C-alpha cells in the first residue's frame, strides 16, 4: 500500500509543480532539483541495496566475477557482513553490481525524471522531502504547496481506508516541510540587512 501510494502521489506532485515552475526541472547550464541526486547519490539508494557494498569481496568470491568457472561457492549463503538475510553469494554479487550501476547513473546526472526514481527503485520520499526543504526560491515552493493542496486521492477498493491513510502519511510530512520552508523565507525577508526594521510598502 505504501509502495503504491508513494509511487503515484509523489510523481503527481512533481508533475504539477513542474507545470508551474519549469525552470527548477529544466535549466540547461543552471541548477535544477536533479542536482540533489548527482551530488549525494547514496542518500537516495535504500540501505538494503547498499548493504556490505563498501567491503571488498572475499578473494574466492571475487574470482568468479570475471571467471565463470570460479563460481563454485556462489550458491553458498553469504555472511551477514556482506549479505541480507537468506542471500547467497550469487545474489550479493548481483545486488552490488546493480548498486554500482545505479550510483554511477546518479553521479553522472543521468536521472532527470521523477519516474526514473521508481524505475531505479530509489528513495522517492526522501528526494521529495529534500527538494522542498532545500527550495532556493518561493516559486518552486509555491508550486509544490499548490500541488499538495489540490491533490485528490481516490481509493479504488473502498475497503478499510488503508490506501488513503498511506497517502496521508506521505502527504503530511511534505505539507509540514512546505510550512517550515515558508517560515524560513518569511524570516529571511523580515530580517533587516542593515540592522534597521524593513520598510513596509
Q: What residue spans do the PLM features occupy?
A:
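Class I S-adenosyl-L-methionine
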Residues: 1-157, 163-200
Amino acid at each position: 500500500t505504501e509502495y503504491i501510494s508513494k509511487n503515484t502521489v509523489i510523481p503527481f506532485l512533481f508533475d504539477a509543480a513542474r507545470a508551474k515552475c519549469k525552470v527548477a526541472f529544466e535549466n540547461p547550464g543552471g541548477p535544477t532539483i536533479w542536482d540533489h541526486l548527482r551530488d549525494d547519490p547514496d542518500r537516495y539508494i535504500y540501505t538494503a541495496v547498499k548493504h556490505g557494498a563498501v567491503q571488498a569481496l572475499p578473494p574466492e568470491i571475487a574470482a568468479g566475477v570475471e571467471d565463470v568457472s570460479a563460481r563454485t561457492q556462489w550458491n553458498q549463503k553469504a555472511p551477514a557482513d556482506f549479505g541480507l538475510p537468506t542471500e547467497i553469494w550469487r545474489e550479493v554479487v548481483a545486488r552490488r553490481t546493480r548498486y554500482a550501476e545505479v550510483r554511477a547513473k546518479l553521479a553522472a546526472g543521468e536521472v532527470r525524471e521523477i519516474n526514473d526514481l521508481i524505475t531505479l527503485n530509489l528513495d522517492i520520499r526522501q528526494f521529495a522531502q529534500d527538494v522542498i526543504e532545500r527550495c532556493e526560491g518561493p516559486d518552486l515552493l509555491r508550486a509544490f504547496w499548490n500541488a499538495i493542496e489540490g491533490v485528490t486521492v481516490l481509493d479504488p477498493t473502498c475497503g478499510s481506508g488503508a490506501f488513503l491513510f498511506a497517502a496521508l502519511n506521505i502527504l503530511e510530512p511534505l505539507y509540514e516541510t512546505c510550512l517550515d520552508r515558508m517560515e524560513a523565507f518569511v524570516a529571511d525577508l523580515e530580517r533587516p540587512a542593515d540592522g534597521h526594521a524593513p520598510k513596509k510598502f
